[in-house]
Amino acid sequence: MGTVIALTNSKGGVGKSTVAVHLAAWCHQCGRHTALVDADAQGASSAWLHEAEPDLAIARLQTPDEILDQVPRLATQYDVLVVDGPAGLSEVTRAVLLVANLALLPCGPSVLDLRAVQEAIRVVGQAQRIRGGPPQAVLVPNKLQVQYRLTQELLATVQTLGVPALGGLRLRQAFADAAGQGTLVWRLGLRGAAATEEITRLFAELNIHESEANHEPSATLS
């Protein structure tokens, strides 16, 4: 069984698709048999990844039944499934959490973003109680501007939420440029160098692997 990594939040505009596309491409380029599941009706991540990595498998699943039926089946065929969930805590999002091993929760540095991620953590907790364990929730602080008070408050608040956090991503033009050009930050040359270093370091923290003892998928923080 492959590792199912969900990108979810109760608010849009927090960087779900940016992380999903780059994570899927990074896993693929690291030699993992990878597919993207686009569960967002807007289809932004699937369109972006189709341009950036046309050889990488993509599935569009739009309903809770499709998620619950197809994701476990796909997980038997791939090492890693990256699921880009819809904005909001809909039944589709809840279905995604019922089949994911890991839930990445991007969060921007605003009061609304913090409220949204707290609600997302609550819903992840519901899925954990139903399943008796997974998915593990991990925060991804995003659009950081370290010199600003809101970013400093976000980073301080993250420590109080009871959920582990990755190193975070700064607000960088390279991420917007990659989306607009249908490419990846590591293909932007010098313009994308800082963003590339940051996002690949963030992914390396996940330690995505399969246990040799029982072949169970897992993703742990380093």
Predicted feature locations:
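Hydrophobic positions on the alpha1 helix immediately C-terminal to the Walker A/P-loop
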Residues: 19
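Structural beta-sheet core signal
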Residues: 36, 83, 105, 139-141
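P-loop/Walker-type NTP enzyme "switch/lid" segment
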Residues: 4-14, 25-94, 179-185
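Conserved nucleotide-binding/hydrolysis micro-motifs of P-loop NTPases
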Residues: 41-43, 111, 144-147, 174
